[in-house]
C-alpha cells in the first residue's frame, strides 16, 4: 500500500514533469503497474540486490528507494554508490538496520541513551518465558508478548490470566496466559520473544522525512478508534530527533509511540520505511 501511495504522491507533485518512476516488486502488484511509468517483476528480496543494480544501470536510475526488508539491499550500498546511484533504505549502515529490526537490541540502545523506552525481558525457551511472565505480572497490571523480529504486529498478544481460551479466535491480540505458554512450549525451534508491560494509552505514529540522521520534516498522526488527528507539533518530535540521529535514519520512515499510565510517551519501534497510513497526512502538505 505505501509503495503505491509514494508513487501517487510523486506523480501529483511539482516534480512529476521531471522524473520517471520505475517500480518493482517480487509480486505482480497490478496497482503499481497502473501508477508507475514502468514496472518490473523482481526476484525475492534476499536475492534482488544484483538484479536491482543491473536495472538501475540499464534504466539510468539516479535514486533507488527501497521498502520492506531493505537491509538486504543496504549491505550493497558501496556498489550502488560506485555507479552514482543514491540508495535510500531507511537507515545508513547494516549495523543500524540490525539494531532497528531487533526489538530487544533497539530497546537496549534507547535505554542506553536515556530515551523513554518500554522495559522488556527477552526469552528464548519455555522456562524463560514462564519466569519472565511471573516477573512482569508482579511489576505491572497488564503485560503483553511480541516476537523480537517481525513486522505489522504479527505475533503480538496481550496476556490475560482470565481470558477464555476461545478469545484468541475472536480477538487475535488477546490470549490466555497459560494457553500462550503451552503454545510456545510446542514451538520447535523456539522463537525469541519479548515480555513487557502492556500500555493501554493513546497511540501515535510519526511520519518522518530525513537525510543521514537529520529530520527534514515530520508530522504525527494520533490514532483514535474511527479517525486520526494530524499534528504539526507534538511532544514526540524531540524524541524522534534523537532517534533519527542515533540510528542514522535516512529516507521516509515511521516511529511509533504509546502513552503509559502517567500519560508519558514511550517508544514502541522505528519502521525504516513509510507506514501504511502515511498518506493520511498528505492534506497537510508536510510529507
Q: Residue locations for each model-derived region?
A:
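Phosphate-binding site of ATP-dependent enzymes
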Residues: 169-243, 247, 258-266
Amino acid at each position: 500500500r505505501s509503495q503505491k501511495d509514494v508513487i501517487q504522491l510523486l506523480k501529483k507533485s511539482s516534480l512529476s514533469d521531471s522524473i520517471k518512476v520505475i517500480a518493482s516488486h517480487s509480486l505482480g502488484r497490478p496497482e503499481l503497474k497502473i501508477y508507475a511509468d514502468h514496472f518490473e517483476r523482481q526476484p525475492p528480496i534476499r536475492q534482488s540486490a544484483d538484479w536491482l543494480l543491473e536495472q538501475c544501470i540499464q534504466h539510468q536510475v539516479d535514486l533507488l528507494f527501497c521498502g520492506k526488508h531493505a537491509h538486504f539491499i543496504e549491505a550493497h550500498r558501496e556498489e550502488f554508490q560506485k555507479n552514482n546511484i543514491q540508495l535510500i533504505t531507511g537507515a545508513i549502515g547494516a549495523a543500524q538496520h540490525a539494531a532497528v529490526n531487533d526489538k530487544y537490541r533497539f530497546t537496549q540502545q534507547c535505554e542506553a541513551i536515556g530515551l523513554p523506552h518500554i522495559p522488556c525481558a527477552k526469552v528464548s525457551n519455555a522456562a524463560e518465558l514462564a519466569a519472565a511472565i511471573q516477573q512482569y505480572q508482579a511489576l505491572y497490571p497488564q503485560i503483553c508478548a511480541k516476537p523480537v523480529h517481525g513486522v505489522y504486529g504479527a505475533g503480538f498478544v496481550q496476556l490475560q490470566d482470565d481470558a477464555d481460551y476461545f478469545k484468541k479466535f475472536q480477538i487475535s491480540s488477546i490470549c490466555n496466559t497459560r494457553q500462550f505458554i503451552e503454545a510456545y512450549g510446542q514451538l520447535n525451534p523456539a522463537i525469541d520473544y519479548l515480555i513487557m508491560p502492556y500500555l493501554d494509552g493513546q497511540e501515535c505514529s510519526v511520519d518522518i522525512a530525513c537525510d543521514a540522521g537529520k529530520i527534514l520534516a515530520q508530522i504525527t498522526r494520533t490514532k483514535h478508534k474511527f479517525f486520526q488527528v494530524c499534528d504539526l507539533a507534538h511532544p514526540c518530535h524531540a524524541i524522534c530527533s534523537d532517534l533519527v540521529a542515533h540510528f542514522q535514519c535516512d529516507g521516509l520512515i515511521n516511529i511509533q509511540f504509546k502513552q503509559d499510565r502517567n500519560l508519558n510517551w514511550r517508544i514502541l519501534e522505528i519502521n525504516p520505511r513509510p507506514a501504511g497510513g502515511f498518506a493520511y497526512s498528505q492534506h497537510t502538505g508536510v510529507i
